[in-house]
């Protein structure tokens, strides 16, 4: 039975993923036509390569339409409800590092923790007659972190369609949940990360669809990639 491995379709993630596979002895033969999103692996007739966006990879793993994929853990946890039941993290690949964080305006000087934010949320309701607005593309992770982990219920998620970090300055939100690598963009927008506001430390991972793990070939490919990382 053939194995389908989904890889990021462009940019540095694609380059770094191909380097990881090469180190594991899987030389990917790229198609001549850049519009062709399928590739093959030299000497591996039963291993199919499919190029997708990182978010598509997370979704297709959840559907079980691909067996293995390389994508960010943040996308896996955000895209898939009950992700632990649907996919498994086979290996952390050591690149694509970024944190999903809770960030508030720097002028909120007395707000440094999630406990402080709980007080702010209640104060917003009492003083302004509305809920605290949080701009984010990570609504699932935000709800889990705020409501389930910290018991904060009085807030409203504002869907972010553009640059999330600009939402507070634009007046469309009071604070944000976003992904950051260095924090420089947050600082440029006069935002600060709460002391206990790191929701997830993410990086690129090799991920398997749970039901695909019954295929011994899937396990073999994942094991070989892990061993390549150790080399």
From Swiss-Prot:
Q: A Pfam family for this UniProt protein?
A: HisG
Q: Subunit structure of this entry? A: Heteromultimer composed of HisG and HisZ subunits.
User: What NCBIfam families does the record tag this protein with?
Assistant: hisG
Gene that produces this protein: hisG
Q: Which family does it belong to?
A: Belongs to the ATP phosphoribosyltransferase family. Short subfamily.
List, alphabetically, the InterPro entries matched.
ATP_PRibTrfase_cat (IPR013820), ATP_PRibTrfase_CS (IPR018198), ATP_PRibTrfase_HisG (IPR001348), ATP_PRibTrfase_HisG_short (IPR024893)
In its keyword annotation, does this UniProt entry include Chloroplast?
no
Catalytic activity annotated for this protein? 1-(5-phospho-beta-D-ribosyl)-ATP + diphosphate = 5-phospho-alpha-D-ribose 1-diphosphate + ATP
Report the top EC class in one word.
transferase
GO BP annotations of the record are: L-histidine biosynthetic process
Q: What is the lineage of its organism?
A: Bacteria, Pseudomonadati, Pseudomonadota, Alphaproteobacteria, Hyphomicrobiales
Tell me the superkingdom of the source.
Bacteria
Tell me the protein's name: ATP phosphoribosyltransferase
UniProtKB keywords: Amino-acid biosynthesis, ATP-binding, Cytoplasm, Glycosyltransferase, Histidine biosynthesis, Nucleotide-binding, Transferase
**Which pathway does this chain act in?**
Amino-acid biosynthesis; L-histidine biosynthesis; L-histidine from 5-phospho-alpha-D-ribose 1-diphosphate: step 1/9
In terms of one coarse class, where is the protein primarily found? cytoplasm
Give the protein's function: Catalyzes the condensation of ATP and 5-phosphoribose 1-diphosphate to form N'-(5'-phosphoribosyl)-ATP (PR-ATP). Has a crucial role in the pathway because the rate of histidine biosynthesis seems to be controlled primarily by regulation of HisG enzymatic activity.
In the record, what terms sit under GO molecular function?
A: ATP binding; ATP phosphoribosyltransferase activity
Q: What GO cellular component entries does it have?
A: cytoplasm
Query: Where is this protein localized, as stated in its record?
Result: Cytoplasm
């Amino acid at each position: 039975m053939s194995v389908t491995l989904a890889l990021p379709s462009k940019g540095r993630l694609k380059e770094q993923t191909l380097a990881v596979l090469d180190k594991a002895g899987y030389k990917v033969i790229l198609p001549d036509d850049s519009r062709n999103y399928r590739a093959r692996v030299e000497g591996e007739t039963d291993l199919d390569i499919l190029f997708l966006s990182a978010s598509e990879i997370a979704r297709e793993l959840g559907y079980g339409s691909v067996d293995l994929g390389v994508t960010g853990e943040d996308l896996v946890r955000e895209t898939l409800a009950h992700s632990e039941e649907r996919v498994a993290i086979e290996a952390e690949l050591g690149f694509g590092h970024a944190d999903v964080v809770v960030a508030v305006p720097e002028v909120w000087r007395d707000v440094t923790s999630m406990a402080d934010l709980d007080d702010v949320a209640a104060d917003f309701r009492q003083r302004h007659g509305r809920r605290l607005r949080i701009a984010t593309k990570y609504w699932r992770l935000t709800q889990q972190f705020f409501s389930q982990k910290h018991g904060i219920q009085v807030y409203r998620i504002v869907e972010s369609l553009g640059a999330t970090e600009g939402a507070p300055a634009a007046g469309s939100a009071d604070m944000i949940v976003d992904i950051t690598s260095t924090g420089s963009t947050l600082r440029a927008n006069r935002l600060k990360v709460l002391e206990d506001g790191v929701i997830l430390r993410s990086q690129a991972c090799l991920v398997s669809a749970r039901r695909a793990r019954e295929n011994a070939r899937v396990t073999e490919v994942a094991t070989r990639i892990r061993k390549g990382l150790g080399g």
